[in-house]
Amino acid sequence: AKETAHQIGTPLTSMVGWITLLKEKHKKSIPLIEIEKDIARLNLITDRFSKVGSIPKLIPSDLTSVIKETVSYLQKRSSEHIKFKIQLPNKKIIIPLNPQLISWTLENLIKNGIDAMKGKGSLNLRLLEKASEIEILISDTGSGMKKEVANKIFKPGFTTKSRGWGLGLSLAKRIIVDFHKGKISVLKTVLGKGTSFQVLLKKAPFKNSKE
């Protein structure tokens, strides 16, 4: 994984240089701005791969901002027939987390919902602050899944013919449960109606949160 990250990193560095040159000639080009965001995201991915095996650092971060940035990025790259409904508190929610890993987890859950809706439907995300934890609910109006499938989707390599989760959700579980000491689950799923995922994160710092 680390070697792959190194190989990807070299052309990415070159792409950053070319984008910088193009921006000097087209300073207000929206496509260039979005391409730059894509490259930045690829850089984050290669950075994660280069640190495989290491324990990620958790720092006090604003979860609200992480969610806004993640949703904004995905919304611009989704079908216009996917309606996003985002409910967030009008304040910062500061908790110990790794912003990049939480963003990746949310992106994975949202993408699964978008895939399940096949280009048309509603994607709802709600952030709720409770006494000792933060709850994130992500719901879609997609195809839903059978109970036996819902019980297996967090296992490494599990997939179906219609939805290819691969390692995505198993890594999401590791990020939430092992690294952030939280919980992730399928809260509800109904065939033909949709699925709701629940993520719970601790509000207070826990042991080794700065390691």
Where are these regions (language model features)?
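Conserved micro-motifs of the catalytic ATP-binding
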Residues: 54-57, 94-97, 160
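Detector for a conserved hydrophobic position within an alpha-helical segment of the HATPase_c
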Residues: 176-177
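Acidic ATP/Mg2+-coordinating residue in the GHKL
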Residues: 140
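Short conserved segment of the HATPase_c
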Residues: 145-157
